[in-house]
């Protein structure tokens, strides 16, 4: 599995009153996402254990290697 070497803000999302968010079409297409695909939300926490960020990962890609892939990405985004 290749790891992402660059991270950037892809979109600003808004949650509706039902708690739903919409991923822009261009982002869905680039990520190869389609209706019915399952995503895992991984929460990043600050020093007070407050959730400060969420990462969405395709469910079929989640395994024991995810921590080693996600950790460097978080460092680039949050410090």
From Swiss-Prot:
Entries under InterPro entries matching the protein: SpoVT-AbrB_dom, SpoVT-AbrB_sf
Q: Which NCBIfam families match?
A: lp_hng_hel_AbrB (TIGR01439), near_HgcAB (NF040962)
Lineage of source species = Archaea, Methanobacteriati, Methanobacteriota, Archaeoglobi, Archaeoglobales
Q: SMART domains attached here? A: SpoVT_AbrB
Which organism was this protein described from?
Answer: Archaeoglobus fulgidus (strain ATCC 49558 / DSM 4304 / JCM 9628 / NBRC 100126 / VC-16)
Residue ranges of every copy of the SpoVT-AbrB domain listed in the record: 10-60
GO MF terms here are: DNA binding
Q: Does the keyword DNA-binding apply?
A: yes
The alphabetical list of record keywords is: DNA-binding
Q: Does the keyword DNA-binding apply?
A: yes
Q: What is this protein called?
A: Uncharacterized protein AF_0476
- What is the annotated signal peptide range for this record? none
Gene3D superfamilies assigned to the protein according to its UniProt record, in alphabetical order: 2.10.260.10
